[in-house]
Amino acid sequence: MPETIYDVAIIGSGPAGYTAAIRAGQWGLKTALIEKDNVLGGTCLHVGCIPTKALLFNAELWDHLKDAKEFGIEGVDSRKLNWAAVQDRKGKIVAKHAKGLEFLMKKNKVETVKGYGKLTGPSQNGTFTVEVVNDNKASHLKAKNVILATGSEARLLPGLEANDRVLTNIEILSLKEMPKSLVIVGA
């Protein structure tokens, strides 16, 4: 059986990667989207932009409720926050978007490949080889073009280590209890 050669392989399924994959699929290119995590969407969808905006909306709504009496709305003085419900809502929003990305990949005939992708070297005979490691097993795929859309990760300041008081975006967005106070360094 002849080896499959993709027109384009994209490493990383965050906003840059999935947008490139969708467009390539729409143009009729044989496309592979390689993602190291078990779900598509990258940092933005799972531990960045989307969950942050979901929590921000909750905070804005809470803030608006304090002025409810001015608008003739009564009975909100005894409002309570159910942090578990807030986190559940955030999780549902993220899951809905992740499912939507899977649908868009299928709709646009983009093949998703699970695993950690890396280029093995320069182009050979007009194709690149991408090594994909999943569950400690390596496979290889070939592509005429490769887009590196590997995204970002949290970086701690020198001398700081993540612990129960120093948190990255990943830990902060999955807190089981709402903190009484919080300082954010960086953006």
Go through each PLM region and give its residues.
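Beta1/beta-strand and adjacent pyrophosphate-binding region of the FAD-binding site
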Residues: 2-14, 180-185
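Glycine-rich flavin
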Residues: 2-6, 22-29, 35-178
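The conserved SAM/SAH-binding core of class I Rossmann-like methyltransferase domains
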Residues: 11, 34-35
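N-terminal Rossmann-fold NAD(P) dinucleotide-binding loop
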Residues: 17
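Short flexible/disordered coil segments
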Residues: 103, 184-187
